[in-house]
């Protein structure tokens, strides 16, 4: 009798397959007692994460994103930051969501190919007002990298403590590479003398794009659309060619261990890196304003 029942059950399973639940095998763990610990692939078979299935962070502050989420965030942050370039948080988000899967790894590999870059990756230094000892930098001779840097900070009214932490890059080492690039940005300003006005930022971003290939730096050039005619002419005539020429020929600026060259002559460092100082943008803008005032005064007189 028992044998007959087993055969009947087996026959029913073979002849009525459509009565069984239709579900992907890899999506849910089996009810079998031998599969109480499903693999991450079984728990997360799709690219969309829910609040219950999102992977754990790989480092403090990390926010894992699916491909769809990362794409949506990249498009949204890119469009809004083009319209409002003062949104540093969105610019940072766009940089992170567009740097993978290729660009940030290329920058990491550039660091690994350099002895100094490898030391930076090993030491993981951070650039803050505390780590740099700003009062000490003010005491350095005017021709040093440190004094040039602090003088630029004071003149532009900015601080090294304003850089957002990286959140959306999955690889922990690549996240540090992005953080390092972000915190070194003001050193690039000081090295080139470019101010933080929109025109200066676009010129520096063009230089960074030629040197690092990070997509965010290239997108920044499109903000020229919202700039004045004189500013666009100045970029295409002066700062754009300078940025491309210097960015391509200069050594990888991400490999400069800034903390170790603060007492170095800034002119010597520029020569070693292959970076020329462009025309003084603030001075050009000042002369332009004065010329405009003279023309207006002459027209009234």
From Swiss-Prot:
- EC id: 4.1.1.130
- Is rRNA-binding tagged as a keyword? no
Q: In which pathway does it act?
A: Cofactor biosynthesis; ubiquinone biosynthesis
Keyword field contains Transferase: no
- Major enzyme class: lyase
Membrane topology of the entry? Peripheral membrane protein
- An example of a Gene Ontology BP annotation on this entry? ubiquinone biosynthetic process
Localization recorded for this chain is:
Mitochondrion inner membrane
Q: What is its main location?
A: mitochondrion
Q: Where is this region: Disordered?
A: 14-48
* Disulfide pattern: none
**Residue numbers binding Zn(2+):** 185-186, 189, 201
Q: Where is the transit peptide?
A: 1-46
List the GO cellular component terms.
Answer: extrinsic component of mitochondrial inner membrane
Q: What does the record give as cofactor? A: Zn(2+)
Q: What Pfam families would the database entry show?
A: Coq4
Describe the reaction catalysed, as an equation: a 4-hydroxy-3-methoxy-5-(all-trans-polyprenyl)benzoate + H(+) = a 2-methoxy-6-(all-trans-polyprenyl)phenol + CO2
Point to the regions of Polar residues compositional bias.
38-48
Q: Name the UniProt key words of this record, in alphabetical order.
A: Lyase, Membrane, Metal-binding, Mitochondrion, Mitochondrion inner membrane, Transit peptide, Ubiquinone biosynthesis, Zinc
| UniProt cross-references to InterPro entries, sorted A to Z | Coq4 (IPR007715), Coq4_euk (IPR027540)
Q: How does this polypeptide assemble, per the annotation?
A: Component of a multi-subunit COQ enzyme complex, composed of at least COQ3, COQ4, COQ5, COQ6, COQ7 and COQ9.
Q: Which family does it belong to?
A: Belongs to the COQ4 family.
What the protein does comes down to: Lyase that catalyzes the C1-decarboxylation of 4-hydroxy-3-methoxy-5-(all-trans-polyprenyl)benzoic acid into 2-methoxy-6-(all-trans-polyprenyl)phenol during ubiquinone biosynthesis.
Spell out the protein name for this chain: Ubiquinone biosynthesis protein COQ4, mitochondrial
